[in-house]
Regions:
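Conserved C-terminal helix/tail region of periplasmic/extracytoplasmic solute-binding proteins
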Residues: 308-333
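C-terminal motif of bacterial Sec signal peptides marking the signal peptidase cleavage site
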Residues: 19-22
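Short, glycine-/small- and polar/acidic-enriched structural segments
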Residues: 28-175, 191-197, 213
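Bacterial signal peptide processing site
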Residues: 24-26
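Pocket-lining segment of extracytoplasmic ligand-binding domains
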Residues: 104, 127, 167-170, 174, ...
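Short, solvent-exposed loop/beta-turn-alpha elements that line the ligand-binding surface or hinge
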Residues: 54-64, 217-221, 290-300
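Bacterial N-terminal signal peptides that target proteins for export
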Residues: 1-12
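Secondary-structure end/capping motifs
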Residues: 236-316
Length: 333
């Protein structure tokens, strides 16, 4: 078991290499395939559903090959997009913001929302952790440094005067893939974790964890973008028709999920099992996951810009919301 190696600073290095001044790149060309990235998470339910039902492939037609790229954290997905290995993807707002700024706005844009909510702080069995205030001196996992849950955790800590050890504080923030977090909770090697669904619900059931903070309680009206849809700018410029068709498929899956969560949940569970080589999610885990996650394409721009402000405040970025005028493209909605 290993923690994920790619983090915010490797992302920054990658950007410098790819977007340095004077760096030439080939002109955008019409595509005969599209690489779609997403996570095996409930917050990416629309992607899981569209992939499993053939929605993406049907939308673009037989002449365009749809290839799936599966990730467990956003910074690694952004690195793949920088390397032109991803064209269209589902990701948390944190890595999308980082990628946009580090590429001087050249690499990507957000064109829709995929989920609101669906992230929480949980504590390992037997730990006396009732709130974020109790994390001092504790070992807390996030999917990846610089990712959306990492930013949320560090912001919550800073708000009460705490910080990670890497910033001179006492909280040991470590990065692990969610599946590894489950094993570490079972072995008692972690105190807490800030994770997306279905891992929150699964670890509560399978490892006896307790829910400490549902992140929705920290946001106005309980709404914030947990997952957004991004597109590689060069791909979108050369293939606006493909992007429009994929967005139609995305929204169709969002609508299908909300129309019948039981049926859609079964499809999504099987897809997660297929991708993670694990078992399907039980009905109670699915129900709990969906109860904390709103699968939606509602515009939640303010929350995305708030993540930018938080990332700046944490020292991840040099600019806050004022540096992201072209990040969210409503014209592509």
């Amino acid at each position: 078991m290993q923690s994920i190696r790619f983090g915010f600073w490797s992302l920054a290095s990658c950007c410098v290499a790819l977007f340095a001044a004077g760096c030439s790149k080939p002109a955008p060309t019409k595509a005969d395939k599209v690489r779609i990235a997403y996570f095996p998470n409930i917050t990416h339910a629309a992607a899981l559903h569209a992939a499993a039902t053939g929605g993406f492939q049907k939308s673009v037609g037989g002449a365009i090959k749809v290839e799936e790229r599966v990730f467990t954290a956003g910074p690694a997905e952004v690195e793949a997009l920088f390397a032109s290995e991803v064209d269209f993807g589902y990701i948390g707002p944190g890595p999308a913001i980082n990628g946009y700024l580090k590429s001087n706005g050249q690499a990507l844009e957000i064109i829709d929302v995929a989920a609101s909510g669906g992230a929480s702080l949980i504590a390992a069995k037997g730990r006396s952790i009732k709130s974020v205030n109790d994390l001092a001196g504790k070992r807390v996992a996030v999917p990846q440094t610089g990712g959306t849950q990492d930013i949320s955790l560090r912001h919550a800590l800073k708000a009460i005067g705490l910080a990670g050890k890497d910033k001179g504080g006492t909280v040991d923030i470590v990065q692990y893939a969610p599946a590894d977090v489950l094993d570490l909770f079972r072995r008692g090697e972690l105190d807490a974790a800030w994770l997306p669904e279905p891992w929150v619900s699964r670890i509560i059931k399978d490892a006896g964890a307790t829910l400490v903070t549902d992140e929705r309680t920290l946001w106005p009206k309980g709404k914030f973008a947990t997952a957004v849809v991004i597109v590689r700018k060069d791909f979108a410029k050369a293939n606006p028709d493909i992007v429009a068709k994929l967005l139609t498929a995305h929204r169709a899956s969002v609508d299908a999920i909300n129309a019948d969560k039981k049926s859609a949940g079964s499809v999504i569970s099987k897809q997660i099992a297929k991708l993670s080589q694990g078992k399907t999610l039980s009905a109670d885990i699915l129900d709990a996951s969906f109860s904390r996650t709103d699968i939606t394409y509602e515009a939640l721009d303010e929350s995305v810009l708030t993540f930018a402000d938080w990332a700046k405040d944490l020292g991840y970025l040099k600019k806050g919301r004022d540096g992201f005028g072209g990040l969210i493209q409503h014209g592509n909605r």
